[in-house]
From Swiss-Prot:
Species the sequence originates in: Pseudomonas savastanoi pv. phaseolicola (strain 1448A / Race 6) (Pseudomonas syringae pv. phaseolicola (strain 1448A / Race 6))
Residues flagged as site, Important for acyl-CoA specificity: R325
Top EC class of this enzyme: transferase
Recorded metabolic or biological pathway in which this protein acts: Amino-acid biosynthesis; L-methionine biosynthesis via de novo pathway; O-succinyl-L-homoserine from L-homoserine: step 1/1
Protein name: Homoserine O-succinyltransferase
Function: Transfers a succinyl group from succinyl-CoA to L-homoserine, forming succinyl-L-homoserine.
Taxonomic lineage of the native organism: Bacteria, Pseudomonadati, Pseudomonadota, Gammaproteobacteria, Pseudomonadales
């Protein structure tokens, strides 16, 4: 990693931690007596405090969305292609806030946090949290930072669900909502994929009912399988065919059940191995449940248009043609509801072969459209 950062990078960033001592009531009926949220900021908050943008992360995301933590970092933050000087979320214009949600495993209070009463990791004792809970905690962070209204709340996938929830829970605090590769709720198929992933973790002998940290182990096999299943759904058939096809790792087949023979097998095992070394199993369970439970229209007799009746934000919805996890049809469903509710909404369906993960990839047309929308936001 060079010590001189690219001209369009936010450069070195230092995470900050906000502590909240006021209890947070949760949708599950429990509450968190106190909690921490770790976050990063990029750019400068203007005098009018009108240029703040909130970034909401997806399932395995975190607060480190842009820049570098040290000169030795091999890779920048997970959305560095979109955040920085001259990029779609231009830090010469906007003050950007990115946090790790409650239940995460990157510094915010979650299952791997130590219970002050027992001195042990909270593990499975950490309560189930929802998208609505996250938005409520994010609103407290906004209060702490002195931000009354977000110029924009932006997210992809699960992050897009949070952006949508902001316009429902705090309609007067969001001026623009950008929901990318997202959906108004999960389909039965999506819930099914999440359940397969959860069962892989829950049935791993090293899971120990969620208390694996106390035993100094991790449910590695379960996490690997969960990630492998999930990763397949993030890619399109075309992109997998182009990248791997039926390519072999070696020149011939071994005719057994244990060898890694196809290149796609090797790739999935690598992804699972890498993920199991950096992500908490209890957090994975929580994140998938938050996805499953997101269904804001359920509180409005399943009328999605009524769900957004009080929203004052302008909406930008983007989807990708080969995304079959959150297909363009789901985005169009959202757009139709917003139009029925007479909201200001624009929609872009981007032709991209990469599948669901396309929202993380610097596709020129995507970045251009993203930037064009952000440039129209008045401060």
């Amino acid at each position: 990693m060079p010590t001189v950062f690219p001209h369009d990078s936010v450069g070195l960033v230092t995470p900050q931690t906000a502590h909240f001592s006021e209890p947070l009531a949760l949708a599950c009926g429990r509450s968190l007596p106190a909690y921490d949220l770790i976050y990063e900021t990029y750019g400068q908050l203007n005098a009018a405090r009108s240029n703040a943008v909130l970034i909401c992360h997806a399932l395995s995301g975190h607060h480190h969305a842009a820049g570098f933590h040290s000169a030795d970092d091999r890779k920048p933050g997970w959305w560095d292609s979109c955040i920085g000087p001259g990029k779609p979320i231009d830090t010469n214009t906007f003050f950007v806030v990115s946090l790790n949600n409650l239940g995460g495993c990157n510094g915010s209070t979650g299952p791997s946090s130590i219970d002050p009463d027992t001195g042990k990791p909270l593990g499975a004792n950490f309560p189930v949290v929802t998208v609505e809970d996250w938005v409520n905690s994010q609103a407290r962070l906004a209060d702490l930072l002195g931000i009354d209204t977000w110029a924009a709340v932006i997210g992809g996938s699960l992050g897009g669900m949070q952006a949508l929830q902001w316009t429902i829970s705090y309609p007067d605090r969001v001026r623009h909502c950008l929901a990318i590769a997202s959906a108004p709720k999960l389909s039965a198929q999506n819930i099914a994929f999440n359940e397969v992933a959860r069962q892989a973790i829950l049935t791993d002998p090293e899971f120990h009912g969620g208390s694996f940290q106390e035993r100094g182990v991790i449910p590695k096999r379960g996490l690997m399988l969960a990630r492998m299943v999930g990763h397949i759904t993030y890619l399109s058939d075309d992109s997998m065919g182009e990248k791997f096809g039926r390519g072999l790792k070696s020149e011939k087949l071994n005719y057994d059940f244990h060898s890694v023979e196809f290149q796609v097998e090797s790739y999935l095992r690598y992804q699972g191995e890498e993920f199991s070394g950096r992500f908490d199993a209890n957090t994975y369970l929580l994140m998938t449940k938050a996805l499953d439970y997101f269904d804001p229209a359920a509180n409005f007799n399943d009328d999605l248009a009524k769900t957004f009746a009080n929203a004052t934000a302008k909406f930008c919805v983007m989807s990708f043609t080969t995304d079959w996890r959150f297909s363009p049809a789901r985005s169009r469903e959202l757009v139709d509801a917003l139009m029925a509710a007479r909201k200001d909404v624009c929609y872009l369906e981007i032709d991209a072969p990469q599948g669901h993960d396309a929202f993380l990839i610097p596709i020129p047309r995507y970045l251009q459209a993203f930037g064009n929308y952000m440039n129209r936001i008045s401060l």
